[in-house]
Structures are given as C-alpha cells and as structure tokens.
Amino acid sequence: EGRSGIENDSVYLCSPQVAAAAALKGEIVDPRDLAEELGDLEAPGVELPEKYDGSKADIIEPDEAVDDDLIKGPNIGDVPLKDPLGADIGGETLLKMEDNITTDHIIPATSDILKYRSNIEKLSEFTLSRVDDTFAERAKASDHGILVAGENYGQGSSREHAAMCPMHLGVEAVLAQSFARIHKANLYNFGLLPLTIDQETYDRIEQGDHVEVVDDVAEAVRSGAEEFTVRVNDDWEATAAFDASEREREILAAGGKLTLTKQQYEEDSGGAAPADD
C-alpha cells in the first residue's frame, strides 16, 4: 500500500507467468491465451559444467583482523537493543487499529522513508503514520505503551523494521485478535509480547485506556504459560492467549534475538561483550 508513490494507489502481486506475458504484450493478459497465440516455444538451454572449480585462485584473502573502528555513514545508526523481559508490562493504549494492518501501515515502504532503514532513530518517526500521523510523538511522550489491533495484524512483507521501530518507541505488547505468522515471529525477535484477544475484549478496549498485564510476565513466559490476565483501567479484566514455542519464549524473555545473541556471546567469550557498533 502506497509503494507506487501515490497515497491512494494499490500495487498488486502477480505470478511470474502473468508478469512475463504482460511484458511481452504491453498489457495485462492471461498467459494461457498468450501461450496459445505464440505456440510451442523452447526454453533457452543452459549447459552446466560437469564439475565446478572449487579452488580459491580467484579469491583475495583478507588481511588479518585488526581492531580498527567501523566507519559508518551519517545515516547509519546503532541497532537498538531491548532489555530482558521484566515482571511488569503495562501502559497506555497508544493506538487501536482495525483488521488487516500491514507492515506497510506500520512502517511505510516508500522511497522517501526507506532511505532511513539503517537509522532506526529517524525511521521510527514514521511508525504507523499511515494510520495516525501523531503516533510516534505520542509514543515517545508515553515511554511505555500498548497496541491493540483486530484480525491478521502484521500481514504483508516480513520487514523487521515493523517490529523494531515500535519497540524503539517504547511499545511493550501488542494485543490483537490474530497475527500474521511472520510478523508475530518478528515481535518475539524484538522482545514485544504478542497476546491474542477475543472479539469482546477488542470491542471494549478504547484508545487511551491503560492496559496492564497482571501476571509476572517474565516468569510466566519462561514457565510455559499459555494465557495472561490483562487489566484495563483498573476497572475490568480479560484473558489473553499466548502461544509460543520454547525457543520463542527464550528469545522473548531475553529481550529479543539480538539481546540473546549478545548474552550468549558474552558467556562464550568469558564476559567480553562485542562492540555496540
């Protein structure tokens, strides 16, 4: 959505056959009709060698590793890391969204924005701007927050920025009626708690409500809990489902995959942490 550069335009995916037929005809046509028109065509042949040369004759060996500083351009920032999961998660419902929120809604994929993809500090300013252009500023002011969504939250291309930027802005959990599979995995990878809520809970929660996960979150995640109790405005409670593999629980409890990898590196190297850059 919006990838063509026009706000209200749509871009559709098609099969390679449809794309090839359109390229040959200059318009969208049924590739089966084009096949009948062109008749039998032989695909170009490619001869593969019986054996590939496995030598390193054409490879220039690198110099020995040195402790030089990594030189980065002005638009390349550090990758944000999240602290390990704590006992408490709660905050303002920063945004309540409808069904089928895509990763393009979460982080627009237009050229004027994607140039900041290596600068999370800047890129996060555009988070959910296609839904509410005040979101980023409100999230920064709130420090900790919750997102609420309908069905199929996070559908579309599997860009990690769609989880990383909300995390950078202080979002701690997403309550949705269902999640797109890959985006849900990315939420785990960046330490955000995905909880599945029913229709009644979705209908009752309003933007601006304070939502708190009642349980000791870190302990519940590690111990295999499959549901959490959420309290809204200290007024009413609901049950939210939590479905995660053992590996996903380990990643989430650590604060995300990057934080977990750093922890494991420190353990394996006797406490020497890699440079942040």
Residue ranges and their predicted role:
Residues 1-277:
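Fe-S-dependent hydro-lyases/dehydratases of central metabolism
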